[in-house]
Amino acid sequence: MFPHRREGQRATCSCVARYTPPMYTAAEHAPRALAAAGLDADSLAARPDLAIAEIAGRDSAAAAVAAVRERGFTTLLPTSVATGTEYGDEDAPARTALHLAELLGEGVEVLPSLRLGSPRLWAALNGRFASVIAQRFRISSPCLACHLYLHLARVPLSLALGGVPIVAGERESHGGHLKLSQISQGIDACVRVLARAGVELLEPIRRTRDAEEIAALVGPGWEGGAPELCCVHSANYAGLDGATAFDELAYARYVHGFLEPAGAAVVEAWREVSEPDYEALVRAVLEGPDAA
């Protein structure tokens, strides 16, 4: 039973502070996000060495630094993407972007950070058909297609800027530990999906195994254990011992039968309309021959 509250009596809450959902701009309407940050798509597209940086935690900052060193980017547009499953420090991505600017110095301009999101796209890829996917492929985790979503949500922005590269910070191994969302086959599938849109997905640290190498990229100024946005689904695929064990054949079938074709369907639909019926697109993939 809820305690009775008399008229005029203020309600109390045990939470430290009221939760406010993070604000974002619809990923499908990239020019709006740019305008809200005081940026102009045409002038940015004219810059020859521009890249979009995926911003999350330390690995994403390390990836951005590595990409600048390897490809010579002189302008980075930091972006974060809302998933609806996050909790914690809402300012963490923006703070990471600021630290990135300090790391790179005056030779690289780090633009104001953008926050994007597409709840309907996330729901279609991860939520609506979760039981169907689990039964069909014998593997299921919201993390699998969430990483595809994180990349896809930046595609309209990239295209608005002339198809500039997107830099991501995924790693195939984290000190010998695997993350189901960052398996080699899945990363390759995401690269191919974005390539269909004419966008290069760069993964400069995907084969960086050791934390010491990441630390060398981000420098001593990075605070160890600094607050970051967390996900309610974190490590949902891990066993009681914390290890990631999965059926590699089932995973390969999932990538071939769902992950890549679903991503491709979204990319192709965007050629015709900015906000397609994502649920219908994913349903069609699951009803198609490749998902059998």
Describe each PLM feature range.
Residues 2-6, 10-292:
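Nucleotide-activated chemistry modules centered on ATP-dependent adenylation/adenylyltransferase
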